[in-house]
Amino acid sequence: MTRLRDEFPVLATCVYLNSNSTGAFPRDAARVLAEYGERLTRWRDETWEDWLAALRRYHAGVERLLGAPAGTVMTDASASALLGRFASCFDYRSGRPRVVTTNREFPSTGFLLRAMARYGLELEVVDVERDDLAPEAAIAAALDERTAFVVVSHASFATGALLDLRALARAAHDVGALLVVDAYQSLGVVPLDVIADDVDVVLGGAHKWLCGSTELAFMYVRRALLSTLEPAFTGWMATDAPLSFAPRSAYAGDAWRFACGTPQVLPALVSQRGLDLLLGVGVAAIRAHSLACTARIVARCGAEGIAIATPPEPDRRGGIVALRFPGSQQVQQRLLAAGHVTSWRGVLRIAPHIYNTFEEIDACLDRLIAERRAAV
């Protein structure tokens, strides 16, 4: 643990429990940034060959994380851009105009899908906060043979609540629809195996649990689907040989077909170290540590009478514990002033990662409970 913690300078400055918002950044990034600057000062066009190879190395790391075959991951600046590119592959004026999502998604999903109504997309937003129906059952009930795909978050960005992806994949595939999973809030802290879970598309990004840079997102697409998907939102990079600068006659044969313009090289370069560190630890070990940490938070806050918005069941709980009480935003700010970094999104979110200790969690909870009592 000490050696791992030494990789992240922020841990020497505070109690950092905010990896669901932005993960701790490895110290190796400074070296990578310097090397990048040096390459720019002695530019040669051949640098692009090295940089595209670096992008493919990052893709390979994400594929390893997902248990995915080679050539099934592509990166871009944001998950929104990649979801838009995927959504642009469909003719919504044909027999499958419907897209289903939930009221638990990060706002970008709804923004994008509603905007595509002009192309014939019919959006249905399922209420998964009902007391009378499990979220998976509510989503399954909304699917039919007119559904092109369903977009769900593996873990809620607000509470960390997990969905059963295998159950949702069965429900989607039973009606001929595809399952698209936003895993931004789970990858790196909760295992996701695209083969075992039978998912079709996974979206994620580097700067949260994967301890990387902003402006780097990625999308996995099931290999068997690749040849059937032709994005309308595309660009010069979406070929097998973009550096030939030839007029495009065909999309790339692999996930590179979801490229667009000039790719996000620097974010991938500085994000590689964080991804490598986490792969070295292994997601199973990270998940075990995360569950032990979040169980500690749930038990302590529950004993204090604090309302917990995160599901208490381990198999329903992602990497976040979300707390709901009057004055929680002010308490979050006072925690920050005292050197305990958490986040607030309508609830106070505590998000321990593999580099956090029980002692740090206890110290944060001591302060949180004291601040809450003082505010009552």
Question: Where do the model's predicted regions map?
Answer:
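Pyridoxal 5′-phosphate
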Residues: 1-376
